[in-house]
Amino acid sequence: MAEYDIAVIGGDKRTAYMVPFFQESGYKVICFGIQETEEAEMEAKHSIEADGYAGSLREAVDSADVIVGGIPLEKKGVLDIRELSRLIRKRHTIFGGVIPETFRQECGERNIVCCDFMQVESIAVFNAVATAEGAILEALRHKDTNIHRSKSLVIGYGRCGKILSDKLKGLSALVTVCSGSQTELALADAYGMQTLALDQLGEKAGEYEYVYNTVPAPLIDEAVLQKMNKDVLVIDIASGKGGVDYKAAKELSVHALHCLGLPGKYACRISARCLTDYVLGHI
């Protein structure tokens, strides 16, 4: 029988805040690897005084049947997905975000329940809202102009792009949506946005004060960066390596920021509650 009910591994302030929420519901929790920030580490250690803090991933996994990871689940220097794969057993239920497809397939083959937070539409939408708000906050923090009446370009009109565009429009920004999809452009137009075909990005890039990228593909390359306004601020919220050539941006003195994990940075407590509620509803 496992010594603890839930092992919380890796992640950021969101996973740190999940610990006391689990405990409030009567679960014993052991933690490992919540090291994104000193605040998160302190929060986790404080919240599990009555439970435990593992000295290794193996100890955490062996100690509980429910494993809750961060978003993303795998984090260099904190959680190696290959090591986790070697340690988990059929008795485990795994939760985390942006879980590699190969890991999820392996879990399926081994009859291990594996739930990706970001495959749950309600969580993904909640995450997109927090990401959009965080992107706007980053823009305000790093540029000394108003968003009101600013010429703002949003690249991509998926879940994040739609919500971000709408929130910028609500702040009276002059929003243009750029996409390679005619359907996305038509939808953006229907919601009152200006639109720009992706193949015109280089030609029009210099017209904008703020550029928000949501597409995880190398769209903002050196050629596009060369055309940008010298005072532009690029906020890249795309996952993985993002969508900006950061080496070229530095050489061209274009202010570009890759802003990952914004919900964990600015909306950690409410995000943690959302994730906790999902886990508790599925164990």
Describe the residue ranges of each PLM region:
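Rossmann-fold NAD(P)-binding glycine/threonine-rich loop
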Residues: 98-115, 237-281
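A short, basic/flexible loop-to-alpha-helix module at the beginning of a structural domain
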Residues: 1, 136-146
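Glycine-rich adenosine-cofactor-binding loop
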Residues: 7-17, 148-168
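Rossmann-like adenosine-cofactor binding region
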Residues: 57, 72-93, 188-264
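A glycine-rich, Thr/Ser-enriched phosphate-binding loop motif common to dinucleotide/cofactor-binding enzymes
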Residues: 121-140
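NAD(P)-binding Rossmann-fold cofactor-contacting core
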Residues: 26-44, 171-191
